Protein backbone atom coordinates (compact mmCIF):
# COMPACT_ATOMS: atom_id res chain seq x y z
CA UNK A 1 0.00 0.00 0.00
CA UNK A 2 1.13 3.52 -0.74
CA UNK A 3 -0.39 6.77 0.44
CA UNK A 4 0.93 9.90 -1.25
CA UNK A 5 0.60 13.42 0.12
CA UNK A 6 1.54 15.56 -2.85
CA UNK A 7 3.22 18.93 -2.24
CA UNK A 8 5.22 21.61 -4.02
CA UNK A 9 8.90 20.91 -3.88
CA UNK A 10 11.69 23.31 -3.07
CA UNK A 11 12.72 25.09 -6.29
CA UNK A 12 15.99 23.81 -7.77
CA UNK A 13 17.81 27.11 -7.26
CA UNK A 14 17.03 26.95 -3.51
CA UNK A 15 17.64 23.22 -3.30
CA UNK A 16 21.27 23.87 -4.29
CA UNK A 17 21.76 26.06 -1.21
CA UNK A 18 21.85 25.51 2.53
CA UNK A 19 18.04 25.53 2.36
CA UNK A 20 18.24 22.22 0.50
CA UNK A 21 20.43 20.73 3.21
CA UNK A 22 18.04 21.95 5.92
CA UNK A 23 15.07 20.49 4.03
CA UNK A 24 16.83 17.15 3.60
CA UNK A 25 17.76 17.06 7.28
CA UNK A 26 14.16 17.69 8.34
CA UNK A 27 12.90 15.09 5.84
CA UNK A 28 15.30 12.53 7.30
CA UNK A 29 14.15 13.38 10.83
CA UNK A 30 10.47 13.01 9.92
CA UNK A 31 11.06 9.71 8.13
CA UNK A 32 13.16 8.39 11.01
CA UNK A 33 10.48 9.18 13.60
CA UNK A 34 7.68 7.71 11.50
CA UNK A 35 9.73 4.58 10.86
CA UNK A 36 10.34 4.24 14.60
CA UNK A 37 6.60 4.50 15.23
CA UNK A 38 5.90 1.85 12.60
CA UNK A 39 8.55 -0.36 14.18
CA UNK A 40 6.78 0.03 17.54
CA UNK A 41 3.54 -1.14 15.90
CA UNK A 42 5.38 -4.14 14.45
CA UNK A 43 6.37 -5.17 17.98
CA UNK A 44 2.78 -5.13 19.22
CA UNK A 45 0.60 -8.24 19.17
CA UNK A 46 -0.76 -8.98 15.67
CA UNK A 47 0.41 -5.98 13.65
CA UNK A 48 -1.51 -5.69 10.36
CA UNK A 49 1.60 -5.24 8.21
CA UNK A 50 4.95 -6.92 7.69
CA UNK A 51 6.81 -3.70 6.93
CA UNK A 52 6.02 0.01 6.86
CA UNK A 53 7.98 3.16 6.15
CA UNK A 54 7.56 6.85 5.47
CA UNK A 55 9.70 9.15 3.37
CA UNK A 56 9.59 12.31 1.33
CA UNK A 57 10.22 11.90 -2.37
CA UNK A 58 11.27 15.07 -4.15
CA UNK A 59 9.90 13.73 -7.44
CA UNK A 60 6.29 12.63 -7.20
CA UNK A 61 6.10 9.88 -9.81
CA UNK A 62 7.43 11.73 -12.86
CA UNK A 63 6.41 15.27 -11.87
CA UNK A 64 9.50 17.45 -11.58
CA UNK A 65 7.68 20.28 -9.78
CA UNK A 66 5.92 18.16 -7.15
CA UNK A 67 7.12 16.04 -4.29
CA UNK A 68 5.20 13.61 -2.12
CA UNK A 69 5.33 12.59 1.49
CA UNK A 70 4.88 8.86 1.12
CA UNK A 71 3.63 6.33 3.65
CA UNK A 72 4.02 2.75 2.46
CA UNK A 73 3.42 -0.69 3.93
CA UNK A 74 3.43 -4.36 3.02
CA UNK A 75 0.17 -5.68 4.44
CA UNK A 76 -0.21 -9.16 5.83
CA UNK A 77 -2.52 -11.38 3.83
CA UNK A 78 -6.11 -10.34 4.46
CA UNK A 79 -5.02 -7.22 6.38
CA UNK A 80 -5.14 -4.55 3.67
CA UNK A 81 -8.01 -2.63 5.28
CA UNK A 82 -6.47 -2.69 8.76
CA UNK A 83 -3.06 -1.75 7.35
CA UNK A 84 -4.56 1.22 5.54
CA UNK A 85 -6.44 2.23 8.69
CA UNK A 86 -3.25 2.00 10.77
CA UNK A 87 -1.25 4.11 8.29
CA UNK A 88 -3.95 6.77 8.12
CA UNK A 89 -4.39 6.84 11.92
CA UNK A 90 -0.66 7.23 12.49
CA UNK A 91 -0.42 9.98 9.88
CA UNK A 92 -3.40 11.79 11.39
CA UNK A 93 -1.84 11.49 14.85
CA UNK A 94 1.27 13.23 13.50
CA UNK A 95 -0.86 15.88 11.83
CA UNK A 96 -2.79 16.56 15.02
CA UNK A 97 -0.07 16.25 17.67
CA UNK A 98 3.25 16.35 15.84
CA UNK A 99 6.40 14.69 17.11
CA UNK A 100 7.54 14.80 20.72
CA UNK A 101 10.82 16.40 21.79
CA UNK A 102 12.15 13.00 22.88
CA UNK A 103 11.30 11.45 19.49
CA UNK A 104 13.06 14.33 17.79
CA UNK A 105 16.14 14.00 19.98
CA UNK A 106 16.47 10.25 19.24
CA UNK A 107 16.04 10.86 15.51
CA UNK A 108 18.52 13.77 15.56
CA UNK A 109 21.13 11.57 17.23
CA UNK A 110 20.53 8.76 14.72
CA UNK A 111 20.73 11.04 11.68
CA UNK A 112 23.94 12.63 12.97
CA UNK A 113 25.41 9.16 13.59
CA UNK A 114 24.67 8.24 9.96
CA UNK A 115 26.50 11.34 8.76
CA UNK A 116 29.36 10.69 11.16
CA UNK A 117 29.66 7.16 9.80
CA UNK A 118 29.69 8.47 6.21
CA UNK A 119 32.31 11.03 7.21
CA UNK A 120 34.48 8.38 8.87
CA UNK A 121 34.16 6.10 5.82
CA UNK A 122 34.73 8.89 3.27
CA UNK A 123 37.99 7.37 2.03
CA UNK A 124 36.24 4.06 1.33
CA UNK A 125 33.40 5.62 -0.66
CA UNK A 126 32.50 3.75 -3.84
CA UNK A 127 32.37 5.61 -7.14
CA UNK A 128 28.65 4.95 -7.62
CA UNK A 129 27.91 7.09 -4.53
CA UNK A 130 29.66 10.03 -6.19
CA UNK A 131 27.83 9.34 -9.44
CA UNK A 132 24.43 9.37 -7.66
CA UNK A 133 25.29 12.64 -5.93
CA UNK A 134 26.27 14.34 -9.19
CA UNK A 135 23.30 12.94 -11.13
CA UNK A 136 20.99 14.20 -8.38
CA UNK A 137 22.65 17.62 -8.53
CA UNK A 138 22.12 18.00 -12.26
CA UNK A 139 18.68 16.40 -12.50
CA UNK A 140 17.04 17.59 -9.28
CA UNK A 141 19.08 20.58 -8.23
CA UNK A 142 20.79 18.86 -5.34
CA UNK A 143 23.84 20.23 -3.57
CA UNK A 144 27.33 18.69 -3.67
CA UNK A 145 29.42 20.13 -0.85
CA UNK A 146 31.24 16.85 -0.15
CA UNK A 147 30.87 14.82 3.03
CA UNK A 148 33.40 16.90 4.98
CA UNK A 149 31.41 20.12 4.50
CA UNK A 150 28.04 18.38 4.70
CA UNK A 151 28.96 16.74 8.01
CA UNK A 152 30.14 20.07 9.45
CA UNK A 153 27.07 21.96 8.25
CA UNK A 154 24.65 19.29 9.40
CA UNK A 155 26.07 19.32 12.92
CA UNK A 156 25.44 23.08 13.03
CA UNK A 157 21.98 22.80 11.47
CA UNK A 158 20.85 20.04 13.83
CA UNK A 159 21.60 22.20 16.87
CA UNK A 160 19.44 25.03 15.53
CA UNK A 161 16.32 23.23 14.31
CA UNK A 162 13.70 22.95 17.08
CA UNK A 163 11.05 20.23 17.17
CA UNK A 164 8.44 22.91 16.40
CA UNK A 165 10.06 23.54 13.00
CA UNK A 166 10.07 19.81 12.26
CA UNK A 167 6.40 19.60 13.24
CA UNK A 168 5.52 22.55 11.02
CA UNK A 169 7.31 20.90 8.10
CA UNK A 170 5.50 17.57 8.46
CA UNK A 171 2.15 19.28 8.90
CA UNK A 172 2.77 21.26 5.72
CA UNK A 173 3.59 18.01 3.91
CA UNK A 174 0.53 16.05 5.00
CA UNK A 175 -1.72 19.12 5.41
Residue map of PLM features:
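M16 family metallopeptidases and their MPP-like homologs
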Residues: 1-18, 38-163, 175
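Active/ligand-binding-proximal structured segments within catalytic/core domains
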Residues: 3, 15-34
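Divalent metal-coordination and catalytic microenvironments
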Residues: 28, 87, 166
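Amphipathic heptad-repeat coiled-coil/leucine-zipper-like oligomerization helices
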Residues: 169-173
Amino acid sequence: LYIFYKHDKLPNDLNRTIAGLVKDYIQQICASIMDERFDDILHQANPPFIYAQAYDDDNFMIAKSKGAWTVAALAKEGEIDSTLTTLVKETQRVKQYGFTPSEYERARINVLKQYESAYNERNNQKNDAYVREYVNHFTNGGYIPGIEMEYTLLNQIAQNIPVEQVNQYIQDMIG
